[in-house]
Swiss-Prot record:
Zinc finger (C3H1-type): 13-41, 47-73, 179-207, 215-241
Organism from which the protein derives: Homo sapiens (Human)
UniProt protein name: Muscleblind-like protein 1
Disease cited in the entry: Dystrophia myotonica 1: A muscular disorder characterized by myotonia, muscle wasting in the distal extremities, cataract, hypogonadism, defective endocrine functions, male baldness and cardiac arrhythmias.
Family recorded in the similarity comment: Belongs to the muscleblind family.
The gene coding this protein: MBNL1
Role according to the record: Mediates pre-mRNA alternative splicing regulation. Acts either as activator or repressor of splicing on specific pre-mRNA targets. Inhibits cardiac troponin-T (TNNT2) pre-mRNA exon inclusion but induces insulin receptor (IR) pre-mRNA exon inclusion in muscle. Antagonizes the alternative splicing activity pattern of CELF proteins. Regulates the TNNT2 exon 5 skipping through competition with U2AF2. Inhibits the formation of the spliceosome A complex on intron 4 of TNNT2 pre-mRNA. Binds to the stem-loop structure within the polypyrimidine tract of TNNT2 intron 4 during spliceosome assembly.
Length: 388
């Protein structure tokens, strides 16, 4: 998507403040030492500021009486730094405009605001944080976003970055979660409610000062619901029995939801702690092979689903199985036959057991109550591969 940004020639980075003492003729510093400009009579000074000659910075100004300032070396260095910062800002603003158009393409209903081109000078004050400017944009320097295009109202960004929620809507949603408020009957306020106080599903407060004019609700006296309000003139609403049951049911639902959320959070924390404490099973332990013989295998990733299935092809499992197969083909390990150990048996039984053990070609004859010792050289000389 091509984005054309027309650069506007900006002379703010070439602007220098004129020395007021020099204008009065009382500056004791020469122009090569004063941090302010000492312009000549041919230079144009507006509002105590003068524009430096761009050609003079390049060393190619050939005008006899130039109306722009030819700065001394120390001011020239400052202007060169300002020029580099201006170029960086122009590139950043071009990227900013491109990202805004991309964001507008993703949200067709949102209007695209024009981005003015402006520069950053050391004398300009930085604006507020630009993080709330657009959720699709990365961290941008606060000076790159002008104050007139920043949102004035505080914004809350939801999980979908393209749908920012105003703070007023979030506050309204928070008020709806409160169980100590009841909506006032509008017909009762007009004097047209045919239902009585004990039949209407809305509140009929006797005192209009209890009503919150922002959302037309009244705050319920929780002490009255618990049967312990002793105020002579309570500023909170004392609801009838059917509205008390409604409030108690809402409180029960909120408490149940909070308990379920706390249980889910605790379970997630416990599961993460168990996963962090689990030690992956070594492949050398699975095969009964010394660790010095085999190279380390890649770790086998655990499946995330509880049913043991995965919906996508996992390259980590494939690498683990391939490394395991290569290990079986390349490393020739010995097959260790089972040697029976019979504790408390008769000599005849032990001799029968050792006879079965000595039937293996490479096993040495074992005496009673002894395990045949096989050297590592003998194991490597016989090519027996373990059966997987």
């Amino acid at each position: 998507m091509a984005v054309s940004v027309t650069p506007i020639r900006d002379t703010k980075w070439l602007t220098l403040e004129v020395c007021r003492e020099f204008q009065r003729g009382t500056c004791s510093r020469p122009d090569t030492e004063c941090k302010f400009a000492h312009p000549s009579k041919s230079c144009q000074v507006e509002n105590g500021r003068v524009i430096a000659c761009f050609d003079s910075l390049k060393g190619r100004c050939s005008r006899e009486n130039c109306k722009y300032l030819h700065p001394p070396p120390h001011l020239k260095t400052q202007l060169e730094i300002n020029g580099r910062n201006n170029l960086i800002q122009q590139k950043n603003m071009a990227m900013l405009a491109q990202q805004m158009q991309l964001a507008n393409a993703m949200m067709p209903g949102a209007p695209l605001q024009p981005v003015p081109m402006f520069s950053v000078a050391p004398s300009l004050a930085t604006n507020a944080s630009a993080a709330a400017f657009n959720p699709y944009l990365g961290p941008v320097s606060p000076s790159l976003v002008p104050a007139e295009i920043l949102p004035t109202a505080p914004m809350l960004v939801t999980g979908n970055p393209g749908v920012p929620v105003p703070a007023a809507a979030a506050a309204a949603a928070q008020k709806l979660m409160r169980t100590d408020r009841l909506e006032v009957c509008r017909e009762y306020q007009r004097g047209n409610c045919n239902r009585g106080e004990n039949d209407c599903r809305f509140a009929h407060p006797a005192d209009s000062t209890m009503i919150d004019t922002n959302d037309n609700t009244v705050t319920v006296c929780m002490d009255y619901i618990k049967g312990r309000c002793s105020r002579e003139k309570c500023k909170y609403f004392h609801p009838p029995a059917h509205l008390q049951a409604k409030i108690k049911a809402a409180q029960y639902q909120v408490n149940q939801a909070a308990a379920a959320q706390a249980a889910a959070t605790a379970a997630a924390m416990t599961q993460s702690a168990v996963k962090s404490l689990k030690r992956p099973l070594e492949a050398t332990f699975d095969l009964g092979i010394p660790q010095a013989v085999l190279p380390p295998l890649p770790k086998r990733p655990a499946l995330e689903k509880t049913n043991g299935a995965t919906a996508v092809f996992n390259t980590g499992i494939f690498q683990y199985q391939q490394a395991l197969a290569n290990m079986q083909l390349q490393q020739h390990t010995a097959f260790l036959p089972p040697v029976p150990m019979v504790h408390g048996a008769t000599p005849a039984t032990v001799s029968a057991a050792t006879t079965s053990a000595t039937s293996v070609p490479f096993a040495a004859t074992a005496t009673a109550n002894q395990i045949p010792i096989i050297s590592a050289e003998h194991l490597t000389s016989h090519k027996y591969v373990t059966q997987m």
